[in-house]
């Protein structure tokens, strides 16, 4: 006896719906080891994202400004396809990719309306890692 076609498999392959959003928020998380760029709409729903590691950089090259620039360009191109024209940029972290990610988004033709630093600053919370001696 033949099996009936599985509807669950057909549901998994459905076409992705493109959102048409004019303005959004770019969250740039710049750590010492990697840079993560997520572009969301105003409600916080992710439209696109990219990382330095996902852009093809491995090891210590992930933590370079150029890797952050390439990742920001990748996330920005997908966001432009979703209709993004204006962006607020929220930067978190002390990493080397902070400025270059913002410049890359600006060079794509996206208008940046606001740049905000949302790096969490402790009110003397956890003890930081010990200083490196080389």
Swiss-Prot record:
Keywords attached to this Swiss-Prot or TrEMBL record, sorted alphabetically, are: Ribonucleoprotein, Ribosomal protein, RNA-binding, rRNA-binding
Instruction: Kindly list the GO molecular function terms attached to this UniProt entry.
Output: rRNA binding; structural constituent of ribosome
Q: Does the keyword RNA-binding apply?
A: yes
Name the PROSITE patterns for this protein. Answer: RIBOSOMAL_S11
- Coiled coil location: none
Q: How does it assemble?
A: Part of the 30S ribosomal subunit. Interacts with proteins S7 and S18. Binds to IF-3.
Q: What does this protein do?
A: Located on the platform of the 30S subunit, it bridges several disparate RNA helices of the 16S rRNA. Forms part of the Shine-Dalgarno cleft in the 70S ribosome.
Q: What is this protein called?
A: Small ribosomal subunit protein uS11
From the UniProt record, report the name of the gene that encodes this protein: rpsK
